[in-house]
Regions:
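Macrodomain-like recognition of ADP-ribose-binding/processing modules
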Residues: 1-158
Length: 158
Protein backbone atom coordinates (compact mmCIF):
# COMPACT_ATOMS: atom_id res chain seq x y z
CA UNK A 1 0.00 0.00 0.00
CA UNK A 2 1.34 3.38 -0.88
CA UNK A 3 0.65 7.05 -1.37
CA UNK A 4 1.56 7.97 -4.93
CA UNK A 5 1.47 11.27 -6.77
CA UNK A 6 -0.12 11.33 -10.21
CA UNK A 7 -0.35 14.11 -12.77
CA UNK A 8 -3.73 15.17 -14.10
CA UNK A 9 -7.30 15.60 -12.93
CA UNK A 10 -8.39 13.63 -9.86
CA UNK A 11 -11.56 12.68 -11.75
CA UNK A 12 -9.41 10.67 -14.19
CA UNK A 13 -8.61 8.25 -11.38
CA UNK A 14 -9.94 4.70 -11.31
CA UNK A 15 -10.16 4.90 -7.50
CA UNK A 16 -13.25 3.76 -5.66
CA UNK A 17 -13.60 6.98 -3.68
CA UNK A 18 -12.55 10.56 -4.36
CA UNK A 19 -12.03 12.82 -1.34
CA UNK A 20 -12.09 16.59 -1.39
CA UNK A 21 -12.38 19.26 1.26
CA UNK A 22 -15.59 21.25 1.71
CA UNK A 23 -16.67 24.14 3.89
CA UNK A 24 -19.63 24.02 6.27
CA UNK A 25 -21.56 26.82 4.55
CA UNK A 26 -23.14 24.79 1.75
CA UNK A 27 -21.04 26.45 -0.95
CA UNK A 28 -19.06 24.50 -3.54
CA UNK A 29 -17.85 27.57 -5.39
CA UNK A 30 -14.27 26.88 -6.42
CA UNK A 31 -11.57 24.29 -6.90
CA UNK A 32 -12.35 20.58 -6.83
CA UNK A 33 -15.59 21.23 -4.94
CA UNK A 34 -16.93 23.27 -7.85
CA UNK A 35 -16.08 20.44 -10.22
CA UNK A 36 -17.85 17.96 -7.93
CA UNK A 37 -20.93 20.23 -7.97
CA UNK A 38 -20.88 20.35 -11.78
CA UNK A 39 -20.17 16.65 -12.39
CA UNK A 40 -22.32 15.17 -9.64
CA UNK A 41 -25.36 17.35 -8.84
CA UNK A 42 -26.71 14.72 -6.42
CA UNK A 43 -23.54 15.02 -4.31
CA UNK A 44 -24.01 18.77 -4.17
CA UNK A 45 -27.69 18.42 -3.22
CA UNK A 46 -26.93 16.02 -0.37
CA UNK A 47 -24.13 18.29 0.82
CA UNK A 48 -26.44 21.35 0.76
CA UNK A 49 -29.12 19.45 2.69
CA UNK A 50 -26.63 18.43 5.39
CA UNK A 51 -25.36 22.00 5.70
CA UNK A 52 -28.94 23.27 5.94
CA UNK A 53 -29.63 20.86 8.80
CA UNK A 54 -26.66 22.36 10.66
CA UNK A 55 -27.24 26.00 9.69
CA UNK A 56 -27.55 27.14 13.31
CA UNK A 57 -24.16 25.64 14.19
CA UNK A 58 -22.23 25.04 11.00
CA UNK A 59 -18.97 24.30 12.82
CA UNK A 60 -20.64 21.15 14.15
CA UNK A 61 -19.93 19.58 10.77
CA UNK A 62 -16.16 20.00 11.13
CA UNK A 63 -14.36 16.66 11.05
CA UNK A 64 -17.19 14.81 9.33
CA UNK A 65 -16.91 13.03 6.00
CA UNK A 66 -20.11 12.69 4.00
CA UNK A 67 -19.73 9.76 1.61
CA UNK A 68 -22.13 9.86 -1.34
CA UNK A 69 -22.42 7.09 -3.96
CA UNK A 70 -22.41 8.08 -7.62
CA UNK A 71 -22.00 6.16 -10.82
CA UNK A 72 -18.76 7.10 -12.51
CA UNK A 73 -19.58 5.32 -15.76
CA UNK A 74 -17.13 2.46 -15.27
CA UNK A 75 -18.15 1.26 -11.80
CA UNK A 76 -19.58 2.42 -8.51
CA UNK A 77 -17.81 5.56 -7.34
CA UNK A 78 -18.05 7.41 -4.06
CA UNK A 79 -17.37 11.06 -3.33
CA UNK A 80 -16.24 12.00 0.18
CA UNK A 81 -17.10 15.55 1.19
CA UNK A 82 -14.53 16.14 3.95
CA UNK A 83 -15.63 18.99 6.22
CA UNK A 84 -12.25 20.55 6.93
CA UNK A 85 -13.20 24.22 7.07
CA UNK A 86 -16.15 26.15 8.46
CA UNK A 87 -16.01 29.34 6.41
CA UNK A 88 -14.29 30.17 3.12
CA UNK A 89 -12.67 33.12 1.44
CA UNK A 90 -10.12 34.21 -1.12
CA UNK A 91 -7.95 36.54 0.94
CA UNK A 92 -5.02 34.20 1.58
CA UNK A 93 -6.07 33.39 5.16
CA UNK A 94 -6.01 29.84 6.49
CA UNK A 95 -9.54 28.46 6.52
CA UNK A 96 -8.66 24.78 6.89
CA UNK A 97 -8.83 23.32 10.36
CA UNK A 98 -6.08 20.72 10.09
CA UNK A 99 -7.58 18.76 12.99
CA UNK A 100 -10.99 18.64 11.32
CA UNK A 101 -9.50 17.58 8.00
CA UNK A 102 -7.56 14.86 9.80
CA UNK A 103 -10.73 13.55 11.50
CA UNK A 104 -12.55 13.41 8.17
CA UNK A 105 -9.63 11.63 6.50
CA UNK A 106 -9.43 9.11 9.35
CA UNK A 107 -13.08 8.21 8.73
CA UNK A 108 -12.45 7.83 5.00
CA UNK A 109 -9.41 5.63 5.71
CA UNK A 110 -11.50 3.42 8.01
CA UNK A 111 -14.10 2.97 5.27
CA UNK A 112 -11.38 2.31 2.68
CA UNK A 113 -9.94 -0.45 4.86
CA UNK A 114 -13.35 -1.99 5.50
CA UNK A 115 -14.34 -2.06 1.82
CA UNK A 116 -10.85 -2.41 0.25
CA UNK A 117 -11.23 0.90 -1.58
CA UNK A 118 -8.54 2.72 -3.47
CA UNK A 119 -8.64 6.42 -2.54
CA UNK A 120 -7.91 9.47 -4.69
CA UNK A 121 -7.69 13.08 -3.59
CA UNK A 122 -6.32 16.33 -4.92
CA UNK A 123 -2.65 17.00 -4.30
CA UNK A 124 -2.37 19.60 -1.52
CA UNK A 125 -5.92 18.93 -0.30
CA UNK A 126 -6.93 21.69 2.12
CA UNK A 127 -3.89 23.77 1.26
CA UNK A 128 -4.47 25.62 -2.00
CA UNK A 129 -7.89 27.20 -1.29
CA UNK A 130 -7.93 26.38 2.44
CA UNK A 131 -4.46 27.68 3.26
CA UNK A 132 -3.15 24.77 5.37
CA UNK A 133 0.53 23.80 5.43
CA UNK A 134 1.14 21.02 2.90
CA UNK A 135 3.95 19.35 4.85
CA UNK A 136 1.60 18.94 7.83
CA UNK A 137 -1.29 17.64 5.74
CA UNK A 138 0.99 15.26 3.80
CA UNK A 139 2.23 13.73 7.08
CA UNK A 140 -1.37 13.21 8.17
CA UNK A 141 -2.16 11.48 4.86
CA UNK A 142 0.95 9.28 5.09
CA UNK A 143 0.10 8.11 8.61
CA UNK A 144 -3.68 7.86 8.21
CA UNK A 145 -3.54 5.92 4.93
CA UNK A 146 -0.38 3.87 5.61
CA UNK A 147 -2.15 0.62 4.72
CA UNK A 148 -4.46 1.99 1.99
CA UNK A 149 -3.71 2.73 -1.67
CA UNK A 150 -3.94 6.50 -2.15
CA UNK A 151 -3.42 8.65 -5.22
CA UNK A 152 -2.70 12.35 -4.87
CA UNK A 153 -3.59 14.03 -8.16
CA UNK A 154 -1.66 17.13 -9.14
CA UNK A 155 -2.88 19.30 -11.99
CA UNK A 156 -0.09 20.26 -14.37
CA UNK A 157 1.77 23.29 -13.07
CA UNK A 158 0.23 23.18 -9.58
Amino acid sequence: MAVIIKEGNVFDSDADIICHQVNCQGVMGSGVAKEVRERFPNVYEQYRELCELHKNYTAGLLGMAQIVPVYGGRKQLYIANCFGQDKYGYNGAQYTSVGALMEALIYVAEQARQFSWKVAMPYKIGCVRGGADWETVKKIIDVTFKDVDVELWRLEGK
